[in-house]
């Protein structure tokens, strides 16, 4: 089929309905022609019915056919009529485009000239009744169908049917039957009809289109409304509206029409019967129920209506959510039936259609989710238990208390009706003094006024207690407090008990006592001081009976209380200090220190007007101050209750300010301090009586009982009491110092050791713990803990062993003569070339040195090792043996050894230098390994006879080339001591740029001159044609004429010569003729000079243009110079970035290795007894802190390494851009060089042309002058006119000469300027090349910096290793001290040697710092540009400082420390693996590093960290050595204190609950991992959806089609 988007208009009318259909079709066509997007409203904007345009809904829509010919290919024949006529047969092949007849041809464009059709298989393949073929058309959306038309390519079927579906998932409904046997085939009456009132949705059957003729081109048109009685009232017929609605159309072909000849089963006949349809058209409109004028594709590529009239849905079949005021209806011609909005009074955006409401009110919109607490179908009233003050305001909740109000509904003002005893607008609270709101009202409060504040809680009745009071009614003191009284702002007084007990009560037997001064007799011990503490005068008045101070300056003076007010005044705590005071002037200036109390190292003060006191005045006023720390009495600084009582318990000073202005006086009287004392009188209830714990005694727990001592003696009664620690050798001790009275040969403050000359374990607690030492002379001894063997501990220097029978490490000899005669132990002699801290430096028997350092060897380390040279006995290690460093290429047999004294290597022939690393002058090729070869430079051609040390290329004279400078360069000549000269042959005029030996060039035809740069006579230079061209033939006459003029000129010159001599006489006529001839020649010369002038002017114009061009080129060169400078800067930055990045990786690796080694080396065992004087607990603690610090550094390194990895990519990208910029610069330089050569050639051409013009003009001028001279020498035989003309000629010649001179001068100036520009350009080019070379060297410098950083890292690691070795030795030393006291004393004697080793280690550290400093210097360049990095570094430093402080505050138990270190080591190993992976990534991306200004700063910080780490480690070792050096003065009390602190630290470690925190972190990590997995799953689902959408998009058509109206022909 070649179908059309528009259905065929020519349907044959039949029946009574066709005129109506014609009118409807015409109206539809007119409506579609004027269809527009806004036709759903009329010109006044009122809604009206609108419909999409009438279209062929089947156009280009895919039809699904259940049978199609061509698979496999088959033959069919065209039916031509009666039997016997020859049939025309063809082939149907689905694989051949021109032979296929697929279902797509049913709905394609209908072209009558080229008909296409769908075709089924033939009857030969079994296509005939009862088998059927279905053609199914899926419209993709509901349409209002007007007709269905089929055009058959063969004869029409005998029987076929049309079906439709109203919904895509609905059943197939018969639409129409066509059959010549309706009753037999479809059980339908033939040509039936529908009566009025009948079922208008039934399908009819007709035989009208079932004839076999025509054999082709037969049409079948089905009109959906034809024969339906309600078609004239379609808008009011829901049955017909449903009838015309279809989403799918199916045509079922049931039986073929035949001539009956198929009964003979002739294959050719059977091949002529088949179904073939050329056009399948469905006329209708997209179904939108009158509420849309168009349909369009949605986001899912589905066809939907573009709904108006507040409707929505695929077919506009529903009202929008808020437009439910009336039921949805289909639009009609009379009414648009648009959906109307609900009336919710602006308080809701949601509603639904309420049929009951619609029937009762005419408005069916029932609002939901009313806002502002409104209710009703239209949100017109407040909800229950809500109110509003105005109709336009929101409703507010009454909030009436359900307990305290009589009703939950309030009045229009929001006030509730309260029950008796309840108050408030909401009846939600009790009246003052009542509590517990219930159904019966509120109950009265029952608070104790001494311990409560204000009223009770209105909900629970619980009273609000003072700070130190508890109980429902605040009727008792909290534990640790006593003496409940109303005057106390805290209610109760805290127990003091010197901090040892929190249980106390009121003491019995104490009465009120006042300490006072009334000044009736004298000043009563009071004195005065100035502000700085110096004494001041005090006056006592017998008349006023007071004391006074007078100030003559602005600085105040104070009254100082006497001793009776001081001392132990803790019984005045919570009581008052009062005095009477006045001043003589009202001008007062108060301060925060008007009343000052001092004691127990504490100091508090208050202003005079504090605690409600008045300003000082001229009238005597009594001032009262309560001695209490409560905030109501603002003593500053604020103290705790215990601190305030501690101050009063040792009160050392009371100061009362006396003067408050300059030159004023203050008067003090009646000072009273309330206190208490034992005895009868008014009871003093504020005195405590403590209940003391075990070991304490006294009313205030201020004493230690017998058998107990002060834990910290210098704290006095504030120190805790602990049991006497005498190890069973004493039952009592001094209660203040704790020193035991030892017996049983024990000694020490706690009897913790044996007396001198005794050995044993005095801590066992028996009388036989200490036994006499078996050593000679009763010297000291010790017991080996494991073997219990007694060994002597005070052997002579250099000896060791259980009985001093062996030489100590570092000594040799045979003290017992076991290997010969007895030889005392002597110090090893190794020429100071051993490490004094090392073990086994020499053989203890022979003294042979075994561990020589500084590259030395020999029995006494007295010579250099092979491959080294120098002085092995030099005092400075740096001056000892150094590596030979012989050059492998220049040394005989590639030896690495040299003279052990001078270091001179054995060189190959013609090789020189101590390391054989250079060739002799005039030789080269050291890399050959066979010695250097002679340069053989030519004596004349080379400059100095030297050559390149690698290539052998000699340095040649200008213009000379060759390996040995033996020949001229191309286009040069004249080989000699000054070099070769350039031929300078003109490229156009010479046959070759190479000249002859005399420098002359071979010229082309028409050129002359040594350089072939001039045209031959009668030749001219044509710019548009290369070379000198011969002048046209006419110029030969000129040449001849010139030859004649030359002959005549010679004759004239001869004549003038003859006139001068007078040898020949000339007649007047002859002279006149010759004069006229001369005049003509002069005129010709003048014309030639004028022509030369014009040529010169043209030349000047050309020179001006050249100058302009040169200026622009110079400007561009300047830009290129700037680019080169920027490129150099960028290259320098890139070099620094690469260098810093590489160094950063090395530093990170080194820091991790250091942390790992340090962490692995801190596993120390705890000594068995902390009371041992040789205990090395401090050493173990320092090791633990060292491990913690290295762990922190390792964590920092991991983070820094990751940052370095990230920033390395940026650094490399910058380097690539820099190199790309350098390549671009090199290209621009090359281009500029080429343009410069072009400009230079043009300038040279102009110079040559100017020179030729100059020569021609000069010759012309000379000739003119000569002619004038000749004329001037003639006798005045002619007229005056001739003379004037001659003068004019002379003047013109002079002017011409001046003009030529001026032009020549301008040209020379221009040429000089050109030379300057040329030099400047050459310099710029050279500078560009230099900058490029500098950029090329940056990578080499980066490599060198990397090597330097690696060397620095190596030195740092070596230094750290040496320091660790020292630490290990010290740990070993710790073990030996515990085993043998004698060995410990010997180690103390070695401390100077150890200090020397530390000095050498410091020296090596400084060397490492210097090596690291070179890397840090480069990084410092970015310091000012990295404020953020500094902030980060500062934060890290603060964090490290905090960590160190925390480590110093806690001394963890050594065994727990070992476990912690093991865990930390595992973490370090994991961090190392992670860092290794990061480093591998960094190595792969090393050359892709980027702008690393931040990375450079971080590299500097890390370099500094490395340096500080080494320095800190050495400092720790020095501290440890100092502590080792002080072992002989061990403080046993200090050791006990450390042991106690260690136990506290252990408790703190347990309290910190690290295991739980780690577990929590692991759980959080698992949660995060699960969340990440969920995110990954979501991402996978989203990606699947995206891929599905992409597949859908690919199946969509690439465009839309806008075809003509369906009703147009």
From Swiss-Prot:
GO biological process, any: maintenance of blood-brain barrier
GO molecular function per UniProt: extracellular matrix structural constituent
Cellular component per GO, a single term: endoplasmic reticulum lumen
Chain ranges of the Laminin IV type A domain: 514-689
Domain Laminin N-terminal, residue spans: 46-285
Residues spanning the membrane: none
Record key words, sorted: Basement membrane, Cell adhesion, Coiled coil, Disulfide bond, Extracellular matrix, Glycoprotein, Laminin EGF-like domain, Phosphoprotein, Repeat, Secreted, Signal
Disulfide pattern: 286-295, 288-305, 307-316, 319-339, 342-351, 344-367, 370-379, 382-395, 398-410, 400-416, 418-427, 430-442, 445-456, 447-463, 465-474, 477-492, 724-733, 726-740, 742-751, 754-770, 773-781, 775-792, 795-804, 807-825, 828-842, 830-849, 852-861, 864-881, 884-898, 886-905, 907-916, 919-932, 935-947, 937-954, 956-965, 968-980, 983-995, 985-1001, 1003-1012, 1015-1028
PTM-bearing positions, type Phosphoserine: 1149, 1493
Compartments, record wording: Secreted, Extracellular space, Extracellular matrix, Basement membrane
Alphabetized PROSITE patterns for the sequence: EGF_1, EGF_2, EGF_LAM_1, EGF_LAM_2, LAMININ_IVA, LAMININ_NTER
Residue ranges occupied by any Laminin EGF-like domain in the UniProt entry: 286-341, 342-397, 398-444, 445-494, 495-504, 690-723, 724-772, 773-827, 828-883, 884-934, 935-982, 983-1030
Residues listed as glycosylation sites in the UniProt record: 60, 134, 576, 650, 1022, 1107, 1161, 1175, 1205, 1223, 1241, 1380, 1395, 1439
Matching PANTHER family: LAMININ SUBUNIT GAMMA-1, NETRIN/LAMININ-RELATED
Comment on protein domains: The alpha-helical domains I and II are thought to interact with other laminin chains to form a coiled coil structure. Domains VI and IV are globular.
Protein name per its UniProtKB record: Laminin subunit gamma-1
Gene (name only): LAMC1
């Amino acid at each position: 089929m070649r179908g059309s988007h528009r259905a065929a208009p020519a349907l044959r009318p039949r029946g009574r309905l066709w005129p109506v259909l014609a009118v409807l079709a015409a109206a539809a066509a007119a409506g579609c022609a004027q269809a527009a997007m806004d036709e759903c409203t009329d010109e006044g904007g009122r809604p009206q019915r609108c419909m999409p345009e009438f279209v062929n809904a089947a156009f280009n829509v895919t039809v699904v056919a259940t049978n199609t010919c061509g698979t496999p290919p088959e033959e069919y024949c065209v039916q031509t009529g009666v039997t016997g006529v020859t049939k025309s047969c063809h082939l149907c092949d689905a694989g051949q485009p021109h032979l296929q007849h697929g279902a797509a041809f049913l709905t394609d464009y209908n072209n009558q000239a080229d008909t296409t059709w769908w075709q089924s298989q033939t009857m030969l393949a079994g296509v005939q009744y009862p088998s059927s073929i279905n053609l199914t058309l899926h419209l993709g959306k509901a349409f209002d169908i007007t007709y269905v038309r089929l055009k058959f390519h063969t004869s029409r079927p005998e029987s076929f049917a049309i079906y439709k579906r109203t919904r895509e998932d609905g059943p197939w409904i018969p639409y129409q039957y066509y059959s010549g046997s309706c009753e037999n085939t479809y059980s339908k009456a033939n040509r039936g009809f529908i009566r009025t009132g009948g079922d208008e949705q039934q399908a009819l059957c007709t035989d009208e289109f079932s004839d076999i003729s025509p054999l082709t081109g037969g049409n079948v048109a089905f009109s959906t409304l034809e024969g339906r009685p309600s078609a004239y009232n379609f808008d009011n017929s829901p049955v017909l509206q449903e009838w015309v609605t279809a989403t799918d159309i199916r045509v079922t072909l049931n039986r073929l029409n035949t001539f009956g000849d198929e009964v003979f089963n002739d294959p050719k006949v059977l091949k002529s019967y088949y179904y073939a349809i050329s056009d399948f058209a469905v006329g209708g409109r997209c179904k939108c129920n009158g509420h849309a004028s168009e349909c369009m594709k949605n986001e899912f590529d589905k066809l939907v209506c573009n709904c108006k009239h507040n409707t929505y849905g695929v077919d506009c079949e529903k009202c929008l959510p808020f437009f439910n005021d009336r039921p949805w209806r289909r639009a009609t011609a009379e009414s648009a039936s648009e959906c109307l909005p609900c009336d919710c009074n602006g308080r809701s955006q949601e509603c639904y259609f309420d049929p009951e409401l619609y029937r009762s009110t005419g408005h069916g919109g029932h609002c939901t989710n009313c806002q502002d607490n409104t209710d009703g179908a239209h949100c017109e009233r407040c909800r229950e238990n809500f109110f509003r003050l105005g109709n336009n305001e929101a409703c507010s909740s009454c909030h009436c208390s359900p307990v305290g109000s009589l009703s939950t509904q309030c009045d229009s003002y929001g006030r509730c009706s309260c029950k008796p005893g309840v108050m408030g607008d909401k009846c939600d609270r009790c009246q003052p003094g009542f509590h517990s709101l219930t159904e019966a009202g509120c109950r009265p409060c029952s608070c104790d006024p001494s311990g409560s504040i204000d009223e009770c809680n209105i909900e629970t009745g619980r009273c609000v207690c003072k700070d130190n009071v508890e109980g429902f009614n605040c009727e008792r003191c909290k534990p640790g407090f006593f003496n409940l009284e109303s005057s106390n702002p805290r209610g109760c007084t805290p127990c003091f008990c010197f901090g040892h007990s929190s249980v106390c009560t009121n003491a019995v037997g104490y009465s009120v006592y006042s300490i006072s001064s009334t000044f009736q007799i004298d000043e009563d011990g009071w004195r005065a001081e100035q502000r700085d503490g110096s004494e001041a005068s005090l006056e006592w008045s017998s008349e006023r009976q007071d004391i006074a101070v007078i100030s003559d300056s602005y600085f105040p003076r104070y009254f100082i209380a006497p001793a009776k007010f001081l001392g132990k005044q803790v019984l005045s705590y919570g009581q008052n200090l009062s005095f009477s005071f006045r001043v003589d002037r009202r001008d007062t200036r108060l301060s925060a220190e008007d009343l000052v109390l001092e004691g127990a190292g504490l100091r508090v003060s208050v202003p005079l007007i504090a605690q409600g006191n008045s300003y000082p005045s001229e009238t005597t006023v009594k001032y009262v101050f309560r001695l209490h720390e409560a905030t109501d009495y603002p003593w500053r600084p604020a103290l705790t209750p215990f601190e305030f009582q501690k101050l009063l318990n040792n009160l050392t000073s009371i100061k009362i300010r006396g003067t408050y202005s300059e030159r004023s006086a203050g008067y003090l009287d009646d000072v009273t301090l309330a206190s208490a004392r034992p005895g009868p009188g008014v009871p003093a209830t504020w005195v405590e009586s403590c209940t003391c714990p075990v070991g304490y005694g006294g009313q205030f727990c201020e004493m230690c009982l017998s058998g107990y001592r002060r834990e910290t003696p210098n704290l006095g009664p504030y120190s805790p009491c602990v049991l006497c620690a005498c190890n069973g050798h004493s039952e009592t001790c001094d209660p203040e110092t704790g020193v035991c009275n030892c017996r049983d040969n024990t000694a020490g403050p706690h009897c913790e050791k044996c007396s001198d000359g005794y050995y044993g374990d005095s801590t066992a607690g028996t009388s036989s713990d200490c036994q006499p030492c078996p050593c000679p002379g009763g010297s000291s001894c010790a017991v080996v803990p494991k073997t219990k063997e007694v060994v002597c501990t005070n052997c002579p220097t250099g000896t060791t062993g259980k009985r001093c029978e062996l030489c100590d490490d570092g000594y040799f000899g045979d003290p017992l003569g076991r290997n010969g005669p007895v030889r005392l132990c002597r110090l090893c002699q190794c020429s100071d070339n051993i490490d004094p801290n090392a073990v086994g430096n020499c053989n203890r028997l022979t003294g042979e040195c075994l561990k020589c350092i500084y590259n030395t060897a020999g029995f006494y380390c007295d010579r250099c090792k092979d491959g080294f040279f120098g002085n092995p006995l030099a005092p400075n290690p740096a001056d000892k043996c150094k590596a030979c460093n012989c050059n492998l290429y220049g040394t005989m047999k590639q030896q690495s050894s040299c003279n052990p004294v001078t270091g001179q290597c054995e060189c190959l022939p013609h090789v020189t230098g101590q390391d054989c690393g250079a060739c002799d002058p005039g030789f080269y090729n050291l890399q050959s390994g066979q010695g250097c070869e002679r340069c053989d430079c030519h004596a004349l051609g080379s400059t100095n006879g030297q050559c390149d040390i690698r290539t052998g290329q000699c340095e040649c004279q200008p213009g000379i080339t060759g390996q040995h400078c033996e020949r001229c360069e191309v286009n040069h000549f004249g080989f000699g001591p000054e070099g070769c000269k350039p031929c300078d042959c003109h490229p156009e005029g010479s046959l070759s740029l190479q000249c002859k030996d005399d420098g002359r060039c071979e010229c082309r035809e028409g050129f002359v001159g040594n350089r072939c740069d001039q045209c031959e006579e009668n030749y001219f230079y044509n710019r548009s044609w290369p070379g000198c061209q011969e002048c046209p033939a006419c110029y030969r006459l000129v040449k001849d004429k010139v030859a004649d003029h030359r002959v005549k000129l010679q004759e004239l010159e001869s004549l003038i010569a003859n006139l001068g001599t007078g040898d020949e006489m000339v007649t007047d006529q002859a002279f006149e003729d010759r004069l006229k001839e001369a005049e003509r020649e002069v005129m010709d010369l003048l014309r030639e000079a004028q022509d030369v002038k014009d040529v010169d002017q043209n030349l000047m114009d050309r020179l001006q243009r050249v100058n302009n061009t040169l200026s622009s080129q110079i400007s561009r060169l300047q830009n290129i110079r700037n680019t080169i400078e920027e490129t150099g800067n960028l290259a320098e930055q890139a070099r620094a970035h690469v260098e810093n990045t590489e160094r950063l990786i090395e530093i990170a690796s080194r820091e991790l290795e250091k942390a790992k080694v340090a962490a692995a080396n801190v596993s120390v065992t705890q000594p068995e007894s902390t009371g041992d004087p040789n205990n090395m607990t401090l050493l173990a603690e320092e090791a633990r802190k060292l491990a913690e610090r290295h762990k922190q550094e390792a964590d920092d390194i991991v983070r820094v390494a990751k940052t370095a990895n990230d920033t390395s990519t940026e650094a490399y990208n910058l380097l690539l851009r820099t190199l790309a910029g350098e390549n671009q610069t090199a290209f621009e330089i090359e281009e500029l060089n080429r343009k410069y050569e072009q400009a230079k050639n043009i300038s040279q051409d102009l110079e040559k042309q100017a020179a030729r013009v100059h020569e021609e003009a000069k010759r012309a001028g000379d000739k003119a002058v000569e002619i004038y001279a000749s004329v001037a020498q003639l006798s005045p035989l002619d007229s005056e006119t001739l003379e004037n003309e001659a003068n004019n000629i002379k003047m013109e010649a002079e002017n011409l000469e001046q003009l030529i001179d001026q032009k020549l001068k301008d040209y020379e100036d221009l040429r000089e300027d050109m030379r300057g520009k040329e030099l400047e350009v050459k310099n710029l080019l050279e500078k560009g090349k230099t900058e490029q070379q500098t950029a090329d060297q940056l990578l080499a410098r980066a490599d060198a910096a990397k090597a330097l950083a690696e060397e620095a890292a190596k030195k740092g690691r070596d230094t750290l290793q040496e320091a660790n070795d020292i630490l290990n030795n010290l740990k070993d030393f710790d073990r030996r001290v515990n085993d043998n006291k004698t060995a410990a004393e010997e180690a103390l004697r070695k401390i100077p040697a150890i200090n020397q080793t530390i000095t050498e280690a410091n020296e090596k550290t400084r060397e490492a710092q210097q090596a690291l400093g070179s890397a840090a210097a480069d990084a410092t360049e970015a310091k000012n540009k990295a404020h953020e990095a500094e902030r980060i570094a500062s934060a890290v430093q603060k964090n490290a400082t905090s960590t160190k402080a925390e480590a110093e505050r806690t001394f963890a138990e050594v065994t727990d420390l070992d476990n912690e270190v093991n865990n930390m080591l595992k973490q370090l190993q994991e961090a190392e693996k992670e860092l290794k992976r990061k480093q591998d990534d960094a190595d792969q991306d090393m050359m892709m590093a980027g702008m690393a200004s931040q990375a450079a700063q971080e590299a500097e910080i890390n370099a500094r960290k490395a340096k500080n780490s080494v320095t800190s480690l050495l400092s720790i070792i020095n501290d440890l050595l100092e502590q080792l050096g002080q072992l002989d003065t061990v403080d046993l009390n200090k050791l006990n204190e450390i042991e106690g602190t260690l136990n506290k630290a252990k408790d703190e470690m347990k309290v910190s609950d690290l295991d739980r925190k780690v577990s929590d972190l692991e759980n959080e990590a698992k949660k995060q991992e699960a969340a990440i997995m969920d995110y990954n799953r979501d991402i996978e689902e989203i990606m699947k959806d995206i891929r599905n959408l992409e597949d859908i998009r690919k199946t969509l058509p690439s465009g839309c089609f806008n075809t003509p109206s369906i009703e147009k022909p």
